Design a protein with these regions (language model features):
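Acidic, metal/ion-coordinating pockets
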Residues: 2-19, 23-339
Length: 339
């Protein structure tokens, strides 16, 4: 059986093995079937699944990992700011393997010819269904980290409707956003009405009354555990995108608001607190160092794909890549209210 770390790596690249192409010579040598990829020892009472930054990609794609990823100050030379052979060495990944292809640009062109495209929402759906079947729906939370509706021809032509329809079939439990706001407030409202799950974001306020625009916290019971999910939309939306698209709304990181919502969640009996964030990895590393009683941060925006969660000040930080290539998973074992 696979360990949790191995599963996080293998689930990330399942699409390379079960994609539209038949097994190539390299893939065949890996001797990995979908069933083998999903063999692992589940732990604890709760499974968190994380997908983020799909950017409208319904079908498998070629998406080359970066050759540069600069970290500043204390973040230089540590995940996610590792690329190529340094990344492979740090995570003990074999060169020319499916994991090497999924996570680095090393010999990318040749490996792309061998392994083919990655991703595809149908393949993502298959993996999620199998995990839910193995664990039981009552133990699994599926969370969408945003940048889901925008980035493809079909999402442009349908103004996001294609992605909302597709994601409804996956049945996420909550979502946050960034490029979703670029459809404008009116279209955003229409799409939110079509969604069958909450659009959480505690860091957006209206500029007239300074009141929250969106629901900040959603409570779930999974595996007999009370879980609070706090949403965090991209804090720089009015700067990175045209401000008129979100006129009348104020964004920001607002760490004091996050801490307030964490405290509120704990007072209401949350045994696990999860921040579903589109801040970007380094911003969320900083938050993990300063916020109290936060158990997990599922981060997005920066498209970093890391094959295991990073523990920062007793907060697990997981980044699940982009464009449908990866699914992040964390199993949580909660005892006496502690993870």
């Amino acid at each position: 059986m696979k360990s949790r770390r191995e599963f996080l790596q293998l689930a990330a690249i399942t699409s390379a093995i079960i994609g539209s192409r038949s097994f190539s010579s390299v893939a065949a040598k890996q001797s990995l079937s979908q069933n083998e990829l999903l063999q692992f020892d589940s732990k604890g009472q709760v499974t968190l699944l994380h997908i983020t930054d799909l950017h409208g990609q319904l079908k498998p794609v070629y998406f080359r990992p970066p050759s540069e990823n600069y970290g500043v100050g204390d973040f230089e030379g540590i995940p996610p700011h590792l690329v190529g052979n340094e990344f492979l060495k740090h995570f003990n990944i074999k060169p020319n393997s499916s994991l090497a292809y999924a996570h680095t640009m090393v010999d990318y062109v040749n490996l792309a010819r061998e392994y083919g495209k990655l991703g595809g929402l149908d393949r993502t759906s298959n993996i999620i269904k199998q995990i839910r079947a193995e664990r039981g729906d009552n133990k699994v939370l599926l969370l969408d980290g945003g940048d889901t509706w925008q980035g493809s021809y079909t999402s442009l032509k349908t103004q996001g409707a294609d992605m909302v329809s597709a994601m409804n079939l996956l049945r996420p439990d909550a979502m946050v956003g960034h490029w979703e706001f670029t459809f404008g407030k009116d279209r955003l409202a229409e799409l939110l009405d079509e969604m069958q799950y909450p659009f959480l974001g505690g860091n957006v306020f209206d500029t007239e009354w300074d009141e929250p625009v969106f629901e900040a916290i959603k409570f779930f019971e999974r595996g007999g555990v009370n879980i609070a999910v706090i949403g965090q939309h991209f804090p720089y939306t009015p700067i990175s995108n045209p401000k008129y698209m979100v006129e009348g709304w104020s964004f920001g990181i607002r760490p004091e608001v996050i801490q307030k919502n964490i405290n509120k969640a704990k007072k209401k009996g949350a045994e696990v607190v999860v921040l579903l964030s589109h801040n970007g990895f380094d911003v969320d590393q900083k938050l993990a160092l300063t916020l109290e009683d936060l158990d997990v941060i599922l981060t997005g925006h920066t498209h970093d794909a890391i094959p295991e969660a990073i523990n920062i000040n007793n907060t697990l930080l997981l980044s699940s890549g982009s464009h449908g290539k990866y699914i992040g998973r964390i199993d949580l074992d909660i005892k006496k209210g502690k993870v």
